[in-house]
Amino acid sequence: MKVITFQTKSALEYLIKNGYLICENKYVDIEKVGPTYSWLINNMNKKVENKTRAKYPIWCWVKCNDSICPPKHKGKRVEGFDVKITFNVKETEIFITDFRRYSFLLSNLYIPDNKTDKDKFERLLKENKITKEELKAYVRKDKFNECRNDEKFLKVCNIIEKSFSKCITSDSNILQGCVWKIDYNQIETIEILSKDDGYVYGSLNYKRKNGKRRDWIAEYYKMLK
């Protein structure tokens, strides 16, 4: 399977020096390693054997419509996306998730199966007087100073977390993946991206001409029947 990852120049230097690339702890923003990331790592460990000392994975693109990764677009470059690496990986070596459904994890929202399921969750929030901002605060402690932790709230969060497994699927036109390690002999091409050329590489969350970013959760809701 051919996939693509975007990395920093220092990551490329590490790759060339060592003959492989892993995610060193010092490059991880610990403040952002909340319940969502912990869930991802725990589930990845169940499906992909970790033969390295790495605690955190390397992210990559698996599918974006008819391509592997998003096409370049005019806009501000994602910080740290200096190098585009195309490499081959076995299916047993990669943890694949649906990009849209994963957006629910970042906001700590329930992933519904259909419209009825969605409405049921909305009623649950209303009955328990829980706001979506409170749910997000629970997983984004880097952006919120405090969060709820009462029994009623945590019970709903537990229901939400049980739905997260729905993002572990290849049934989507936009797929992302995580690997523990990239060996140099897996690499097909390495492309140094031009600096300040006015393009966004490897991202779907850039601002559009209207100044807004795509709402992936809203898009998923529209797909429900």
Where do the protein language model's features map onto the residues?
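Residue-level marker of intrinsically disordered, low-complexity segments enriched
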Residues: M1-K2, K26-V28, C157
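ADP-ribosyltransferase catalytic core
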Residues: I22, K26-D29, G34-K129
